[in-house]
């Protein structure tokens, strides 16, 4: 009988460990929000009833990036543009995305606050739009969300600007990022 009690405890311990390992995986899947592709959607990330052309989706994030570079006087800027799917299948709708890196001057926390203050003075709203969650410093304005954090090279900051999920062109097989550094930096 003692042997069966030990076996039972071992089996229960294994089941508990398995449940503890699987629960976060299942919870992660539950957090993925389905973004329906339907006309007249009330989903704040998708208004495919009023789609943006490729040029409009690009301008939606490139213009604010230019303004941020100028307003915060960002130095050694490098930037790229791409279309990002708004779902985990890689299908439409898409949003325009700008990823830019910039040289940090002095303490990174203080410099991020300098950039944040410059953005706030140009009409950006502190924090993400309602219903969205990000790590790092996040601001939003006119359907664009900007998220700022340290780059892998800690002498640089990184900002990612995401537009609205309103581009219905299929960019599923696009695999290039367009270098837009020259568009953001004034000569």
Curated annotation (Swiss-Prot):
It comes from the Bacteria. It is a lipid-anchor. Its main location: membrane. Keywords: Cell membrane, Lipoprotein, Membrane, Palmitate, Signal. One of its GO terms (cellular component) is plasma membrane. A lipid is attached at residue 29 (N-palmitoyl cysteine). The keyword Membrane applies. A lipid is attached at residue 29 (S-diacylglycerol cysteine). The keyword Transmembrane helix does not apply. It is found in: Cell membrane. Residues 1-28 form the signal peptide. This is Putative lipoprotein LppJ. The gene is lppJ.
């Amino acid at each position: 009988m003692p042997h069966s009690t030990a076996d039972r405890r071992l089996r229960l311990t294994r089941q508990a460990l398995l449940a503890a390992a699987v629960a976060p995986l299942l919870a992660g899947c539950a957090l993925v929000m389905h973004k329906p592709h339907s006309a007249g959607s009330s989903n704040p990330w998708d208004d495919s009833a009023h789609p943006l052309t490729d040029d409009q989706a690009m301008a939606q994030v490139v213009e604010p990036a230019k303004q941020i570079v100028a307003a915060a006087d960002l130095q050694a800027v490098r930037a790229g543009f791409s279309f990002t799917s708004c779902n985990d299948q890689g299908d439409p709708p898409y949003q325009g995305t700008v990823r830019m890196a910039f040289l940090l001057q002095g303490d990174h926390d203080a410099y991020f606050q300098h950039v944040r203050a410059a953005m706030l003075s140009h009409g950006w709203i502190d924090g993400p739009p309602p219903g969205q969650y990000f790590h790092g410093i996040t601001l939003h304005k006119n359907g664009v969300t900007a998220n700022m954090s340290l780059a892998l090279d800690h002498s640089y900051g990184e900002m990612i600007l995401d537009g609205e999920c309103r581009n219905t062109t299929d960019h599923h097989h696009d695999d290039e990022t367009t270098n837009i550094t020259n568009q953001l930096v004034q000569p």
